[in-house]
């Protein structure tokens, strides 16, 4: 039961991150120039803000409902996907089929949807899977600190927080949710690594600045 709300929030948060991060990254990689520079400097500025401070500010002002947590997590974890999508776009932007699409007068949206997205989709999905695991840890951390879901909603982070006072005689009340959360995060990470290897994606490659 403890993982249901965490999976719900982080799954849809990851979808939001993939959608907006992927589109912005591909668009910046395609148009380049001043637009690319401005957007990436904005992304860099947001990346410099500690996510925990920003999330705490958001939940204090707007509350801890899923309608707040899902888009907030999706925004903060989409910034990294922007860089990955942009780097993947740079790898294919000079290929002949992109040049041909530009020569035929296709719009940027048409090139993104029909030419670029099918070629960078795999990299975005692998990065999204990794962000999902990090988002699970972030969501559980918020619940542990009392800024996530509220009782009686079952959540692993909340269970760990409430079980701390029972460690002396009921240690399993803390160990069980820790093991469950750790197993899920490790499983998602291993699945993402396996997917990257199957698709031939090098996750160690640096994104261009």
Task: Pin down the residues of each PLM region.
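Alpha-helical membrane-interface segments at transmembrane helix boundaries
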Residues: 1-8, 36-47, 63, 117, ...
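Transmembrane alpha-helix signature in integral membrane proteins
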Residues: 1-30
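Generic hydrophobic transmembrane alpha-helix motif, especially the helices
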Residues: 16-20, 29-91
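Transmembrane helix boundary and interhelical loop/hinge segments in multi-pass membrane proteins
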Residues: 34, 87-97, 191, 195-202
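Non-cytoplasmic
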Residues: 53-57, 65-70, 74-83, 124-158
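Glycine-rich helix-loop "coupling/hinge" segments at transmembrane-helix boundaries
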Residues: 58-61, 88-89, 138-180, 204
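C-terminal transmembrane helix and the adjacent membrane-cytosol boundary/short C-terminal tail
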Residues: 59-62, 66, 75-76, 122, ...
């Amino acid at each position: 039961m403890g993982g249901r709300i965490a999976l719900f929030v982080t799954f849809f948060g990851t979808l939001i991150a993939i959608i907006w991060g992927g589109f912005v990254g591909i668009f910046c990689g395609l148009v380049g120039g001043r637009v690319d520079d401005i957007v990436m400097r904005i992304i860099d500025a947001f990346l410099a803000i500690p996510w925990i401070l920003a999330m705490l500010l958001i939940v204090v002002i707007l509350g801890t409902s899923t309608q707040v947590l899902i888009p907030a997590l999706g925004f903060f974890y989409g910034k990294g996907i922007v860089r990955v999508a942009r780097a993947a776009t740079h790898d294919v932007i000079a290929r002949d089929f992109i040049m041909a699409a530009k020569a035929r007068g296709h719009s940027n949206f048409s090139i993104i949807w029909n030419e670029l997205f099918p070629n960078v989709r795999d990299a975005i999905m692998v990065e999204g899977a990794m962000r999902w695991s990090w988002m699970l840890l972030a969501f559980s951390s918020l619940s542990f600190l009392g800024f996530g879901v509220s009782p009686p909603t079952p959540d692993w982070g909340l269970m760990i927080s409430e079980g701390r006072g029972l460690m002396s005689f009921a240690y399993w009340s803390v160990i069980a949710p820790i093991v469950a959360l750790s197993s899920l995060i490790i499983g998602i990470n291993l699945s993402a690594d396996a997917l990257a290897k199957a698709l031939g994606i090098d996750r160690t490659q640096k994104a261009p600045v």
